[in-house]
Amino acid sequence: MKLSPKAAIEVCNEAAKKGLWILGIDGGHWLNPGFRIDSSASWTYDMPEEYKSKTPENNRLAIENIKDDIENGYTAFIITLKM
């Protein structure tokens, strides 16, 4: 599912509340219709073995990444979560 910047940040906030790890974010441009991914706007954060204590930091970094991408003109995102 492609998400607007606001929705992508909301997903990260909800993931943090539920203790879910954000594995990656891919930024791109919504073209109406369609989505063009930009490989230079791909963010991943390796999941350590003892990840639960680091989940809040991971999700904070994910939100910071989205905000940086918004400033760089990206308009749509795909988020990958670890359930």
From Swiss-Prot:
Organism of derivation: Escherichia coli
Keywords from the named record: Bacteriocin immunity, Plasmid
Pfam hit, one: ImmE5
InterPro entries cross-referenced by the UniProt entry: Colicin-E5_imm, ImmE5_sf
Taxon lineage: Bacteria, Pseudomonadati, Pseudomonadota, Gammaproteobacteria, Enterobacterales
Alphabetical GO biological process terms: bacteriocin immunity
Gene3D superfamilies: 3.30.190.30
Keyword NADP (UniProt): no
Name of this protein: Colicin-E5 immunity protein in ColE9
